[in-house]
Amino acid sequence: MKEGIHPKLVPARIICGCGNVIETYSTKPEIYVEVCSKCHPFYTGQQRFVDTEGRVERFQRRYGDSYRKGR
């Protein structure tokens, strides 16, 4: 490997929205995520709807019931 071209790795904490903290190494000291293996439905086995940033609500506001009536 060439000297001086690789980013410096530091101990990092990955912090999930559910409160889970994962210790690892990265170029950033803290990384924030919305879901992790402790709360994601695929890993927990629970049927749960994951809505990021209110996309369903935004769609409902924009189109409302007119979307369903056209079908």
From Swiss-Prot:
This is Large ribosomal subunit protein bL31. It comes from Thermus thermophilus (strain ATCC BAA-163 / DSM 7039 / HB27). Its cofactor is Zn(2+). GO terms for molecular function: metal ion binding; rRNA binding; structural constituent of ribosome. GO terms for cellular component: ribonucleoprotein complex; ribosome. Part of the 50S ribosomal subunit. The gene is rpmE. Pfam families: Ribosomal_L31. Belongs to the bacterial ribosomal protein bL31 family. Type A subfamily. Signal peptide: none annotated. Zn(2+) binds at C16, C18, C36, C39. SUPFAM superfamilies: L28p-like. InterPro entries: Ribosomal_bL28/bL31-like_sf, Ribosomal_bL31, Ribosomal_bL31_A, Ribosomal_bL31_sf. Binds 1 zinc ion per subunit.
